[in-house]
Amino acid sequence: MKPIAHIHTDLPQKFGIPRNSFLAPHLQGRIIFEPEFALDTAVEGLDEFSHLWLLWEFQNGTPGGAAADIAADLATKDKSGATSKWTPSVRPPRLGGVERRGVFATRSPFRPNPIGLTCVKLDHVELTPQGPVIHVLAADLRDGTPIYDIKPYIPFADCHPEATGGWIEDAPWHELEVDFPDQLRARFAALAEASKLEGLIEVLHQDPRRAGSKHEPDRVYHLAYAGLDVAFTVDRDVLHVLGVD
């Protein structure tokens, strides 16, 4: 198999990528086709659907991306994405990174085959001289992730109201409160597209830190987003944005 496209998002590094799609519903993404598949006829009728399935590839244990950004992950001493080796049991973030579950009962990236499956909202299809561009929302993918297939979400086949969520139902995710001063919001809007601010705030709500991170209220974290460096601290349940550069 070979990629048919790559998705471009505002998250170039592993740090900050939502742990599932739709946790940051306003996070923007653009799917750019490889020249062989950049044909208007290939997407005819796609804009009649509201949601899509994306099949994609994990690279080095994380959604794919540029080598420089993967190296930046390693420089932070987060080794969780440094190898693609799979393990039969994993520690899901939703369980605080402590309890284990079987890999096939989770969506861990450390699998026998590095295949990812994501549902996204279709915003619109743009036809350009270079080929169609699919604009999506709510993806949980790093910038540059290779896409292997795109399929429409079909409600009568894909939606199962009676479905149960297993152990996840007993482990609700706790979001952080985000303190984002007005002057820093204005600075973000001056340096980047204002429409990207809502997605950033949603990413911060999800707590970008590793599951089980110890309480270090004075530690300054840095999130790469939309070409900017967003600095913040976390004190208990509140994330404080300190700077946008």
Task: Identify the role of each PLM range.
Residues 1-119, 123-245:
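Glycine-rich, low-complexity intrinsically disordered segments
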